Each structure stands twice: as C-alpha cells, then as structure tokens.
C-alpha cells in the first residue's frame, strides 16, 4: 500500500503529515493495479514489453486524478475537481505494424553516438530538479517502498540531481555535454527563462564549431500559483544548432 499510505490522507496514520496527492480511494486503486501488473510479470503471464506498457498506462491514469499543479513537487492544499474523479486506465492505441527503433535510459553524459548521427538535446532550464518533481511516478514505476520525508514525502533523489539545474554549473554542463558527443550536428533547445544567458551560451558553444540561433517565438509561461502569475507572462524558446563538422 505504498501510494495509499504515503501520498493520500491515510498518511496521517504513519507520519505527522496528511498528504493529499490522491484520495484514499484512488491511491488504493493505484496500489492494487501496480501490484497486479507486478504479479502478472513475475508469473510470466506478460513479458517486459507488456509490463512497461501497462505501467506507462497506469502512470498516465494517475496523473489524470492527481491533486497537483503540473508536477509532483508538492500537493495542493484544497482538492481539485480533477482529483475527485475515479482512476481510469484507458486502452492505448498501438501501431498496427512493428516499427524498428532503439531506446535507452541513462545519463546523457554516457550516451554513445556516431559522427553521422543528429542529436537533439532538451536539458532542464531552471532549478526544478526532475528527480524530486516527479518522485511519485518514480515510485510507481520502480514499485519499491523507499523511505520518504518532509511534507511532500520525497523519496531520496539527490544522487540523481542534474547539474543543468544549478545556475553555477549549467553552462559548463551544457558545454561538456555537447563537447563530449561524437555527432557532427547537435540541436539544443533552450529558453529565455534558463539559468544561462543566451549570448553567453552561444559564445561558449562557438568554440566547438559553427553555431546558428533559431528563434521559435514566444510561449505562455508555466504559472502554477499567484506569485508566478505576477511575473513575466511569456518566455522565448530557441533552438541552437551546433555544427562540429570540420570545414563546415
């Protein structure tokens, strides 16, 4: 009962905090579904692909009834209308034919690419650490029972902290990432909301090859609360093209 006991009002029975990420009913359903998927997988009734598919469907369904403002950094004090709905797992539309592709999960600094590959990078722009902002989906996916702490009930995450999210480390991290990739052509997505000034970033990457800056225009700024809503309403999105091929 990991989700129910940690992330619903039932948490008050186990810690000083009444967490409201999910209603007790929905949290119990999440636990039940996740346990059943695990039993099917361990019993050989489904394979690794089916296991991943069903867990992904559960994560999507859980997000649909979570009492949050976009991420799981913390729960909302008052219940939203969305959170009062019932957990519902929808059938996913699958492609009728197999598509040959390859995916990997790991540290971007460890990714191996070929010179002829084209790489697209979309690093975090701000201080928001994904490891902490999405801790509950991590717990559902791993199906473990970590020790959690604080009002938000965070699982241990600092070992997964991203250097891109620290203002003092972001520029060097981006440079090291681009420099370490063997691909000749690299595209980097960045924002005016980011830690690094755009001109500073472009000048830094210019030492690796030809750099072209493409403006993608303005988008609405994410505003989860009144404080954020009072700030600048839009941000500029950019695509930085780095061509490392000799002579280009």
Briefly describe each language-model feature range.
Residues 105-110:
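Conserved SAM/SAH-binding loop
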Residues 198-204, 208-247:
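Class I S-adenosyl-L-methionine
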Residues 163-209, 216:
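Conserved Class I SAM-dependent methyltransferase catalytic core
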Residues 5, 113-133, 189:
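Conserved proline-anchored active-site loop of SAM-dependent methyltransferases
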Residues 4-95, 127, 131, 135-167, ...:
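Class I S-adenosyl-L-methionine-dependent methyltransferase module
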Residues 115-119, 149-162, 234, 245:
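Mobile, glycine- and charge-enriched loop segments
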Residues 102-104, 214:
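General small-molecule cofactor/ligand-binding pocket signal
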């Amino acid at each position: 009962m990991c989700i129910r006991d940690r992330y619903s009002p039932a948490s008050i029975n186990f810690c000083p905090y009444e967490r409201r990420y999910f209603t007790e009913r929905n949290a119990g359903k999440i636990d039940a579904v996740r346990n059943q998927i695990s039993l099917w997988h361990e019993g050989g009734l489904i394979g690794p692909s089916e296991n991943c598919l069903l867990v992904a469907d559960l994560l999507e369904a859980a997000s649909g009834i979570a009492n949050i403002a976009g991420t799981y950094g913390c729960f909302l004090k008052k219940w939203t209308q969305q959170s009062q709905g019932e957990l519902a797992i929808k059938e996913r539309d699958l492609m009728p034919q197999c598509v040959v592709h390859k995916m990997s999960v790991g540290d971007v600094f460890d990714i191996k690419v070929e010179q002829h590959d084209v790489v697209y990078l979309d690093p975090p722009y701000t201080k928001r650490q994904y490891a902490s902002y999405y801790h509950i989906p991590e717990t559902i996916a791993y199906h473990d029972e970590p020790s959690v702490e604080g009002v938000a009930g965070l699982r241990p995450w600092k070992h997964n902290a991203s250097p891109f999210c620290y203002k003092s480390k972001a520029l060097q991290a981006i440079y090291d990432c681009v420099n370490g990739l063997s691909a000749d052509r690299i595209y980097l997505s960045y924002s005016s909301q980011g830690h690094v000034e755009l001109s500073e970033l472009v000048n830094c990457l210019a030492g690796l090859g030809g750099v072209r800056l493409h403006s993608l225009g303005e988008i609405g700024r994410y505003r989860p609360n009144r404080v954020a809503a009072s700030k600048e309403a839009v941000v500029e999105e950019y695509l930085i093209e780095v061509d490392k091929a000799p002579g280009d």
